[in-house]
């Protein structure tokens, strides 16, 4: 049952759908997908079986070829038509999802939004290998970062600087930098340190 406040305030929802396994969707994410009028989804990252939960009548808009500006423009247009609009993000929207930029654009149009979290790749990788990321007397810290590339890294956030902490280190968007990352990490971590590599980790079979 919706509260009066929920009925009065319409929002655009940014929804994390996890790694692509339908069984790992949150209940809230599933309900949103099942009831949405318009669904934006990255067809290059999110499997169609996630979209299959939606209404047959819902409009599905693929975003893989659209710019962020174009996506938000269409979202605003559909929202102003009185439709329930959601955008699906692989993993969790708050990790490398450009969600802040989208929310700021919506705010300029006085449109409310919400973020619904999803299971992230580092959690799937750890669960697959039954790996605890915070072990007493070894590390109580998890660092989520990337190995550089086209997007520059802030000062003091180079892989070398972060590796000095010898914490559990999760590198996103870094498949092309495995060799250079390995060389850097071996300066600070012992050679026998356990490493999990995942690529398009939709299911456990994509991890080793």
Per-range role (PLM):
Residues 205-206:
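Conserved small/polar residues in nucleotide/adenosyl-binding loops
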Residues 156-194:
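Conserved anion/nucleotide-ligand pocket segment
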Residues 141-156:
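A short, charged helix-loop
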Residues 1-7:
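Short, Lys/Arg-enriched N-terminal segments with co-localized hydrophobic residues
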Residues 121-133:
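Structured adenosyl-cofactor binding patch, chiefly the S-adenosyl-L-methionine
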Residues 7-116, 124:
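Class I S-adenosyl-L-methionine
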Residues 15-16, 87-89, 145-146, 172-173, ...:
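Short beta-strand segments
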Residues 131-145:
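Short, glycine-/small-residue-rich phosphate/pyrophosphate-handling segment
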């Amino acid at each position: 049952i919706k509260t009066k406040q929920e009925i009065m305030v319409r929002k655009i929802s940014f929804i994390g759908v996890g790694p692509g396994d339908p069984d790992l969707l949150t209940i809230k994410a599933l309900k949103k997908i099942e009831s949405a009028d318009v669904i934006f989804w990255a067809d290059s990252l999110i499997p169609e079986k996630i979209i299959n939960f939606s209404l047959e009548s819902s409009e599905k808009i693929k975003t893989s070829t659209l710019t962020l500006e174009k996506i938000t423009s269409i979202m605003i247009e559909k929202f102003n038509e009185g439709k329930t609009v959601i955008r699906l993000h692989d993993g969790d929207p708050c990790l490398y999802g450009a969600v802040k930029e989208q929310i700021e654009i919506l705010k300029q149009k006085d449109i409310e939004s919400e973020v619904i979290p999803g299971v992230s790749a580092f959690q799937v990788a750890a669960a697959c290998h039954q790996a605890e990321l915070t072990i007493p007397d070894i590390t109580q810290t998890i660092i989520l970062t990337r190995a550089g590339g086209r997007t520059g890294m802030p000062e003091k956030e180079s892989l070398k600087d972060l590796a000095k902490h010898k914490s559990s280190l999760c590198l996103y968007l870094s498949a092309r930098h495995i060799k250079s990352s390995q060389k850097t990490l071996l300066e600070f971590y012992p050679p026998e340190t356990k490493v999990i590599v995942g690529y398009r980790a939709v299911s456990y079979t994509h991890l080793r």
